[in-house]
């Protein structure tokens, strides 16, 4: 991998350092693309388990915007590991510049295998992931496992770039691996009565019944594509895609937009950790 050069981000230690209740902003080298992020701890009695990445880097003459939300469960070690290693692993793939999609899929798999092999250190927990790579402001690759989501605004219309990996929609895969999907009254469907997503990093005790391969989607960025929103399910449980895009477009400052989205989720009584990144492309 070529040497990386990072720039355009304030509060750098929070951007790539640790989970916290935090906010910050940054921009690309020429200042045309700006981002803001806001993370708010949920009401559950455990430490913040959401981690994120938001930064621009230079590699092989290309400017890459790297954005991610990692929503952990049963501890923060797996999302912290992803924050440190997943993008690095993607960019290390020899074919990344020629075939980003294949490289992303390969790096997701290798990263999950590394997490499982270090489960004695990382614990029994796991994490969802949504990652977005913006190349030279012109092309976007989005990948995800779990229910963290990326939504793109094209002409003001919300376009969901990810697929929510939920147990009831992937029941056949789970049952084909020998697992089951519970559906208890008053609760969401769960893999083996435990996990509310059907794909995740980690979760060694459930891995034989889970998947960790991502869905990947790419899109050209044109003059009609103005905003990208990434968020954990703490936002999406209480807000529709179009609502989030409308807020992010109305508030021109992406930091203020991200804060408004997390604040509105709290107003709507979201109880989970809430993490949001708003990228203003135009």
Curated annotation (Swiss-Prot):
Its cofactor is Mg(2+); Mn(2+). Mn(2+) 1 binds at residues 71-72. One of its GO terms (molecular function) is protein serine/threonine phosphatase activity. Residues 34-281 form the PPM-type phosphatase domain. Binds 2 magnesium or manganese ions per subunit. SMART domains: PP2C_SIG, PP2Cc. InterPro entries: PP2C, PPM-type-like_dom_sf, PPM-type_phosphatase-like_dom. It catalyses: O-phospho-L-seryl-[protein] + H2O = L-seryl-[protein] + phosphate; O-phospho-L-threonyl-[protein] + H2O = L-threonyl-[protein] + phosphate. CDD domains: PP2Cc (cd00143). Keywords: Hydrolase, Magnesium, Manganese, Metal-binding, Protein phosphatase. Coiled coil: none annotated. Its EC number is 3.1.3.16. PANTHER family: PROTEIN PHOSPHATASE. This is Probable protein phosphatase 2C 10. It comes from Arabidopsis thaliana (Mouse-ear cress).
